Amino acid sequence: MACVGNSITYGTGIANRDKDSYPAQLQTMLGNKYLVGNFGKPGATLLRHGHRPYFKQQEFRDAMAFHADIAVIHLGINDTDPRNWPNYRDEFVTDYLALIDSLRQANPKVRIILARLSPIAHRHPRFISGTQQWHEQIQASIETVAEISGSELIDFHAPLYPYPFLLPDALHPNAEGAGIMAKVVYSSITGNYGGLHLPAVYTDNMVLQRDVPITIHGKANAGEIVKVKLGSLYQSTRANQQGNWQVTFAPQKAERSTTLTVSAGKQKRIFQDVAIGEVWLCSGQSNMAFMMHQAATAQRDIPLSGDEDLHLYDMKPNWETYDVEWNKSVLDSLNHLQYYRHSAWTVASPDVVRDFSAVAYYFGRMLRDSLQVPVGIICNAVGGSPTESWIDRHTLESRFPAILNNWLHNDFIQPWVRQRAAKNIAQAKGEGVRHPYEPCYLFESGILPLERYTVKGVAWYQGESNAHNIEAHETLFKLLVDSWRQYWNNVSMPFYFVQLSSLDRPSWTWFRDSQRRLMQQIPNTGMAVSSDLGDSLNVHPTHKQKIGERLARWALADTYHRPLMPCGPLFKCAWREAGNKVAVSFNDAGKLSTSDGKPVYGFEIAQYDGLFYPAHAEIKGQLVILQSDKVREPRFVRYGWQPYTRANLVNGDGLPASTFRGEVTTHPCVSRME
């Protein structure tokens, strides 16, 4: 067996490459029945016109003389050099096919296996100047070559990509990384993928999403027949050469208890009490992680929380990000993405609910009460986590690479986030140690393990750890929604989020208004206002029931098309009326009133931006009329513009109006009244 490649195949950077390079480790795995040859040439390019063509190296000639029965080719990394790809990209496919032809001439029966390129990390000095894009283009060309030549295709990229510490110099895998590559080749050659494997989220009491195709998937040894039975439904399939298999059942109606059985060879997994209903993911930071026993309603509601139709999947961290130093064992686990505890689906009961997210529980309970079908809630929130930690690596690499660089000293990331992370990993020596707050980390440790488990939508409560830079958050939040919708292959997946509450932090007025505008800019999103439930001194207000239920209102109105108001009054526009009066119009206004029965409070107007004065406010039907003797020509209006606000405008359902800031125009607008 010939391993054809460059310095990665050769084992550059590995202290004992004769023992730990990927070909050497592969030899150990395969045993004496195989002879593995390492024909890696550091710096080699696939391109004949590259700066060091593999065709011209002694390693190429040695590989031809080896007359391999199997050849694994991993070339193309060095072709990302600006001397190569920009000039000779049109020759890549033909040059690769020529290399394959050469191996086939040496042995017409040779089994050719092409490898998708291993990752190049963002720390590479040329990453943002072209290397990242060219790396992707070469990946696509390798897939084309595999199709044309009829060669097998394996993946060196996916298993290394979430583990940047395996690439100490951003390019060459260390011994552990080389071992992962060897295992990929070993499994491809032998078909041994360790037998039947299913996603960890498949357990007893799981809930499958109703009214959409139900896909069951996993791993098995190559070629093995996999049989899947869901209730009375049955399908079988065969695991492909990469060990992957899946079956898809037609959409099913809600069902309270069925059985899922998956078997392959002598292995069988049986999952009992499987329900079919509605599945939602609840995520974010500490206010979503905030547990029921901490909530103001705990003593009343926990004893009554037993519900066989409400199923919970609680992903709790192994280590909270308290103000402590973690030991080396913890740091090693973090590097290997072992941050969350093992979990399993459970039916709601007082013992389970007491430690479950309060917001997620009330969200799920209201959906279950309203829809009268089983509801499954997955919660993976992590206290203190910033938005960027929840976004996939490729999205940040291609659309916000600056946030990845030197993240512990990166001004895009909130100082408190960086300081807490630095404290937790203080015992680490050298670079490369990861932390839950690091960009991408929680996507890789908390989203990827879900393995695209079908969810109806997302309920999100986060933002406190990004309120220092509103403009950056506006970019990051859009990337987050795009990232998750792409991951679940659902471009219109509902994404409902909580606006930050009231707290005595000066940037929060602007942040709340930014969140309001984000809802208007991103399709299929909705925002639950919580400013009326805040605590001036506590970032974790205890009144969570209304927040969870406000999120559920959005889902019921917007996703399930129930006839109810999704939210409180949302600013539509403001215009000048006679004299110095301003009329403010709202969407979702219903019957405007105040939460306390007192005069409307919280409006300000200004002639010059930045010089606002309190306005007398009067409700007239669907409008609020404003006036101030100190403002002769009003041009700007704002509402609830205090970090801790006592603004009191609500609609007919008692739902509060959002903080907003806007310009005063000369013409009225049409509001949406629901």
Identify the role of each PLM range.
Residues A2, I8-L97, Q133, V247, ...:
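Conserved SGNH/GDSL esterase-like catalytic core that processes O-acyl groups on lipids
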Residues T28, Y54-G195, M366, P439-S531, ...:
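Alpha-helical cap/lid subdomain in secreted, periplasmic
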Residues Y193-A222, V274-C282, A289, W554-C573:
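Non-catalytic, glycine-rich low-complexity segments
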Residues P199, M206-Q209, V274-M292, D301-L304, ...:
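Low-complexity, Pro/Ser/Thr- and charge-rich linker/hinge segments at domain boundaries
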Residues H217-R300:
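Extended acidic/polar, glycine-enriched regions
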Residues Q241, A289, D301-I302, G306, ...:
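Catalytic-domain carbohydrate-binding cleft regions of carbohydrate-active enzymes
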Residues A296-T346:
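N-terminal structural subdomain of ketosynthase/condensing enzymes
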